[in-house]
């Protein structure tokens, strides 16, 4: 639903309630109240779709992955509405919420914005900031052939040894998600809620295919999924809403978010694919929803294989796939020796300039 603000001089009426229309959507013109209600109904409808999967048809404790951007802050608003924190909620979906923000580097401006917004609008929701130093002290080592060394506790995480910017950023995204699942287990959360909009999910479909991780698309784009050998549900209730709609929604409601997160996208596969879909919203407004609906038709394959590096489900025998898709076939001696490394990570490891030390998530004790 691509939208634009109507000129104040326009004399059009809302198609729903006959009040003055303020937002022009793909199909009609609506007022602020009806636009907000439409967005919230879309998100709540997705939440209701996953309710039957939860024990007792609700989550005892849900962890909200908050980056501070538009989508995650909009997700926080809706999750709080559906929680037990509202006294008038007769059918809550969440008994408890825990908002978590991972802070990379020393800049705490985003964390401060999130904390102020939560204190003002959601005072009952606990909020935790996990710093980089707290997470990345213990590592395991891997070389370009996927060999793992588990006794590397004295080394720091060193993504700079990956020469490719795209591979480096990809690794950071995968480690972040791995940390989220690990922390959810330790915090006794049975659910993780992500604020991925439809625009983000459509971009992620292309991103995963380009990285050679197409096998993992159902886990990364479904409204509700569970990783193999993991009891935590992964929810993405904003998958039917465009990022442009969420920006209008947040502005109308006067809710804070960090706009800098949108402007400062790195020049990586993720940034390129998301910019691609955002730029096509005006010309092809149905493109994002088409890609999202297509991804929802992909069924979760039956597998127990997990990549030791990115922790995503993987198709086994990554070395065979690498040999088939490489123009100049490398010698078997130089190939990936660890069969527990997925195809996407095996490609990234090829660009290593030295030994890579990856956070040993299970040892961190976060």
Curated annotation (Swiss-Prot):
Q: What keywords appear on the UniProt entry?
A: Cytoplasm, Nucleus, tRNA processing
State a single Gene Ontology molecular function. Answer: sulfurtransferase activity
Cytoplasm as UniProt keyword: yes
A GO CC annotation recorded here is: nucleus
Q: Name one GO biological process term.
A: protein urmylation
Specify the pathway: tRNA modification; 5-methoxycarbonylmethyl-2-thiouridine-tRNA biosynthesis
Q: Does the keyword Glycosyltransferase apply?
A: no
Give the domain of life.
Eukaryota
UniProt-annotated location(s): Cytoplasm; Nucleus
Its predominant location is cytoplasm
Quaternary structure and partners: Interacts with ctu1.
The record's annotation in HAMAP family points to: CTU2
Xref: PANTHER family: CYTOPLASMIC TRNA 2-THIOLATION PROTEIN 2
Instruction: Give the similarity note.
Output: Belongs to the CTU2/NCS2 family.
What this chain does, per the record? Plays a central role in 2-thiolation of mcm(5)S(2)U at tRNA wobble positions of tRNA(Lys), tRNA(Glu) and tRNA(Gln). May act by forming a heterodimer with ctu1 that ligates sulfur from thiocarboxylated urm1 onto the uridine of tRNAs at wobble position. Prior mcm(5) tRNA modification by the elongator complex is required for 2-thiolation. May also be involved in protein urmylation.
| Record-given protein name | Cytoplasmic tRNA 2-thiolation protein 2
State the organism of origin: Schizosaccharomyces pombe (strain 972 / ATCC 24843)
The top of its lineage is: Eukaryota, Fungi, Dikarya, Ascomycota, Taphrinomycotina
Q: Which gene encodes it?
A: ctu2
